Regions:
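C-terminal non-catalytic regions of proteins with extracellular/luminal or membrane-system context
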Residues: 1-320
Length: 320
């Protein structure tokens, strides 16, 4: 876990004994060092992979990390894939335009090759049924419907913690405050690589007729209804996300905040109505002056979309 590996080549002569000195620095957490040697290999694995890619109809290229690279209580040294995996992806994609890159990682990574891959699947660390699940998705037995629970940045320097990491004396302050996650990218007007809430499907969905309706819940102060239609040819599931913006807010608050979401299953051509009800708490901010949650009198814009940046419909109401 932790730092990138340091590699070097040493020529050994048969029958001689050698002494090696390995130096490393302990920074106060998880003191450990791993030492290993790779036996000479008559095969050039990069050349073998690219040769196969050149001849194949399509390529499923599985890359990623494991607990040696990312784990709880420890930070990754960079967002690059370990070793020469990025180089491998670049070369394979250049040789075969039908390359599906499968990311078996536990967190975002940089993707210099993003425009070269035909498709990219973020599979996280799915466990022992990974192979069966992956084949079901790739061969269309199952239509994927997951959404990203975090933002994938284009570069490490785009992340909220970049300017303050690693802190001092093993302590780091998260200075973005309320603007965590997608809220940071909204405020700084930084385009992510893949937005919070982004996902793939073999079908398409149309959002329409978003409107304010009378709330039915006893604690609701606003309600919105919309229609969603499966406009494709296969069964699919969509997670409709509802965000709230405050027009001309006098409070230092995020540009928009996810307040509601609902997963809906639709056959080809089928439409359903979805209703989102909002309570005072959904619209409140914490007043440090009054030490209480309060609703700011303002125009509240309700947006629905397929991700934090893929907004399909919006409408507004005045509250307060």
């Amino acid at each position: 876990m932790g730092s990138a590996p340091k590699r070097g080549k040493i020529e050994f002569k048969e029958g001689q004994t050698y002494s090696l000195v390995i130096e490393y620095k302990w920074e106060g957490r998880f003191p450990a060092v791993q030492i290993g040697m790779q036996a000479p290999d008559q095969h050039d694995l990069m050349e073998e992979a690219t040769s196969l890619a050149k001849e194949a109809d399509a390529v499923i290229l599985i890359v990623g990390t494991n607990s040696d690279w990312e784990t709880e209580g420890n930070d990754r040294a960079s967002l690059d894939l370990p070793s020469n995996q990025d180089e491998l992806i670049e070369k394979v994609c250049d040789l075969n335009k039908n390359t599906v890159v499968v990311l078996n990682t536990g967190s975002p990574c940089e993707m210099s090759w993003v425009d070269k891959a035909n498709s990219i699947l973020q599979c996280w660390f799915p466990g022992q049924e990974f192979g069966n699940s992956l084949s079901d998705v790739l061969f269309g037995e199952v239509n994927p419907s997951g959404k990203l629970p975090t933002t994938f940045p284009k570069n490490l320097s785009d992340t909220p913690a970049y300017s303050t990491y690693p802190g001092k004396d093993l302590q780091m302050d998260y200075e973005e405050g309320l603007f965590i996650g997608y809220r940071w990218y909204d405020r700084e007007e930084i385009e992510p690589l893949f937005a919070f809430g982004h996902g793939l499907s073999y079908t398409t969905f149309e959002y329409s007729n978003l409107r304010a309706v009378p709330p039915k819940g006893t604690s609701s102060v606003a309600a919105f209804e919309l229609d969603i239609t499966n406009s494709g040819d296969v069964f699919g599931k969509e997670i409709v996300q509802g965000y709230v913006k405050v027009s001309e807010s006098k409070i230092d608050r995020p540009i928009k905040e996810l307040k509601k979401f609902e997963k809906v299953s639709l056959e080809p051509g089928e439409s359903k109505k979805i209703t989102f009800e909002l309570t005072e708490r959904d619209l409140s901010f914490w007043s440090e002056t009054n030490q209480s949650w309060q609703v700011e009198p303002a125009e509240y814009i309700f947006e629905v979309g397929a991700s934090a940046i893929d907004i399909r419909e919006s409408t507004s109401v005045w509250l307060g």
